[in-house]
Amino acid sequence: MPKDTSISSILVIGSGPIIIGQAAEFDYSGTQGCIALKEEGYRVILVNSNPATIMTDEAFADEIYFEPLTAESLTAIIKKERPDGLLANLGGQTALNLAVELEETGVLKEHGVKLLGTSVETIQKGEDREKFRSLMNELKQPVPESEIVDNEADALHFAESIGFPVIIRPAYTLGGKGGGIAPDKEAFTAMIKQALLASPINQCLVEKSIAGFKEIEYEVMRDSNNTCITVCNMENIDPVGVHTGDSIVVAPSQTLTDEDYQMLRTASLTIISALDVVGGCNIQFALDPFSKQYYVIEVNPRVSRSSALASKATGYPIAKMAAKLAVGYTLDELKNPLTGSTYASFEPALDYVIVKFPRWPFDKFKNADRKLGTKMKATGEVMAIERNLEAAIQKAAASLELKNIGTHLPELSGLSIDTLWDLAITPDDRRFFVVMELLSRSVSIDDIHEKTKIDPFFLHTFDNIIKLENRLMEAGSDLSFELLKKAKEKGFSDATIASLISKTEEEVRALRKEMGITPSFKIVDTCAAEFDAKTNYFYSTYFGETDGDISRKEKKRALIIGSGPIRIGQGVEFDYSAVHGVLTLQELGFETIMINNNPETVSTDYEIADRLYFEPMTTEHIVNVAEQENIDFAIVQFGGQTAINAAEALEKAGITLLGTSFQTLDVLEDRDQFYQLLDELGLKHAKGEIAYTKEEAASKASEIGYPVLIRPSYVIGGMGMIIVDSQAQLSQLLNDEDSMPYPILIDQYVSGKEVEIDLISDGEEVFIPTYTEHIERAGVHSGDSFAILPGPSITSGLQQGMKDAAQKIARKLSFKGIMNIQFVIDNGNILVLEVNPRASRTVPVVSKVMGVPMIPLATRLLAGASLKDLNPAVQNHHGVAVKFPVFSSHAIQDVDVKLGPEMKSTGEGMCVAYDSNSALKKIYTRVWSQKGSIYLQNVPEDVKELAENAGFTIHEGTFASWMEQEGNSLHINLSGSEEARKERLEAMTHGIPVFTEEETVRAFLQSGSGHPQPVSLKDLYKKEVASCTQ
């Protein structure tokens, strides 16, 4: 069936800012989908408020709207753009919920918009717990004993009738938001309130707990001809009870018999056919490990986190195919681009094993509740590919960028057996490492299985690693060829082996190469070598010979180092930079080699770089790839702190770094050298010192004068930063040795206006598209600040002063490429706060708002062009953008959103308008439309007057009485007290927006005069182009 020619324009709904449960995987799926639609000649209208994404670039859509993802906003865009079709199954839960709302309110019918792909009826059958259960009963597909409830009384009555523990699953939510396992009545009573609040239709499923069953997922595709295939099946190492996003996942499944596999495959195909899904669908099962009894847990009638994982695990482009199916194609009409010969109706086959390992934010949030359950808490994930499970597990662990040594966390070595058992039975993010610690202490596999319900197969796999560790320690420096080869085959890194035999990583590498033990590189081809595949997708292993032909061509080869897993401080914006670096290098005639390990991202789409290597971002693996490819140079400016941290080791390995030498990086990261540089250039900065001991820290803080800012070096996202107001507070902080990784930096804290610039330089001149002004004072991390660009109060004199400072720094360092500089304006004085010699998280924002392709320009400068050659210019526009932070308070409990120098937001959004008040008002559309009650604490009197003048009602009673009433719009709480923290957390758990900074409050209240209307990026630009003189 050919494509649908009755439609010519399609509205695509994106997933919005990154939050836990809905992250970079939707940029990958959305980008694939937009590319697929553009290939077919459709006009694509994209609505997505996330500026950090690839999909919101001009190349992927004809009109791009950074607008609130609300039904009201989409209705206005539909009236303006008059699309023929709407595609909602690429934008996660956000897009699905909006599609249902637009259908139910009659907007789609009124404006003649056809919902493409999966119908609203199908969405409701998958998402509405009552309709889902009814359909499963019709199909005779077993579901756990359950009850659909819409009030607390009915919920409690049912829970008590079936007995605790029970699982609570809210309808129309993602990442298990609002749900969980309630072990008893007390926990249930608290959880059911939050669960009903979390569901947009106030509906929950309360079901008998089947925690401890195996959790199995099938990723399935279906077309309009009812042709169905399973793309991939996956097995969670953690049993049912831990959200799949928080579980280590293996593909293909490892412990199912063929009968089990076929039984669940048949059930998957039955379900997707009955749902009438057109596109991709994820189906989750619970399987009794002691029988053939299974239950259907959940169906996601859309592309999902698991879809992205399945796509990267198999090489099958699920989102791209889903978009093509949505416009009428069938699976037997579409070719798999990875093989070039098989059709999309051909089920992938794997001759390797993949492991997905979640990445949690608890290295930043040490006091948060890290226990795992049915509510997802991971911010991102890594994926590893290997020929055996032991090696895949070890590669995945090496990809996490934690303080682990192989499969061990040093912090666990001092814990008692009883404490380790507690952590294993009631799991948190360290569970895998806890199990490895138990095994290393000779605890039996049977005991661990009995208490954790982890399948013995996986535990034996883990124990194989421990046994090989013991053999390596016994051998010591007398390491045989056979033992070293075995260790490498099982995934032991050079660094881990070095730690076991008391040698350096360099010594192990030299010994390995001397023995002729080097990796081979195998291809991912979707067909297990059954067909001749033209693939460029590789992974390393120590089995067999290298696949494919990578013989040297005439082109120079560039290695681009990616940014690894999504975590707070290093999000999808760095993938944006890496992808544009690759595309520009290709335009310039280079062969591009991408190394990364994040299955959610566009950069790990095999169609982006000339060759893709899915590998840990460690020195060993990066150097292995560089040697295999015989690269000419590497670029570390586009991969965030991950790539920057690899710079020294890469230079030592003889790899040329383009644009940024390690010496330059060291000058900017080491505070002593940095301040010496600024002093030499005559640039003002806050007073700062380095302290190597507790006593030195106390002495230097007193010398500088309070308040001071304390932080470690070489970090991103402000990790470990804190503002200290007094000697007493410092003493308390210094007594906590774990929080102070010496040496530490102690800077004078200056509370002024913060401004940042993203610039490009050829080593002589600099080009600055705009000056981004933070709304909050300095001291609030730039990633957590609201920011306006172009900055409205940055005078021409201040602009010139900042440009002069930037030019002095770039010339002194002979810096080429892209750089971010943060300034504080204090009583008219310009102080240099920080210089980041890499692409920053604001690069995508600046690029899109100002119409300047920052990364392509920076890449050309790295390749040898001058600014004079490029003559960059900003597009003349008559609008403004406001960037705003987004926090995942629904997932990470006990983390206060009181802003400070350590970043806490998981993502960012952006709204554009013709004035700043209108842009700001869009961010809080629902608050302004409601204009309900506000609770104020510790605010100036005139703020109260501003709120009343804006039409809000001020609650004069206690916080407790305010929380008992309905119609609450906003909690404004500027206090730093413990009571205030608890109040903020309670407000957030009820979905009430919270402001913690006076500057944000004032900007918000002033925005009431704005007049929001849909504004696309193209609407902002005029036809003529103006040269940038900043």
From Swiss-Prot:
Binding positions (Mn(2+) 1): 284, 298
Example GO molecular function: carbamoyl-phosphate synthase (glutamine-hydrolyzing) activity
GO annotation (BP), single: L-arginine biosynthetic process
Binding residue positions for Mg(2+) 2: 298, 300
Entry note about domains: The large subunit is composed of 2 ATP-grasp domains that are involved in binding the 2 ATP molecules needed for carbamoyl phosphate synthesis. The N-terminal ATP-grasp domain (referred to as the carboxyphosphate synthetic component) catalyzes the ATP-dependent phosphorylation of hydrogencarbonate to carboxyphosphate and the subsequent nucleophilic attack by ammonia to form a carbamate intermediate.
NCBIfam families recorded: CPSaseII_lrg, PRK05294.1, PRK12815.1
Protein name, entry field: Carbamoyl phosphate synthase arginine-specific large chain
Gene name of the record: carB
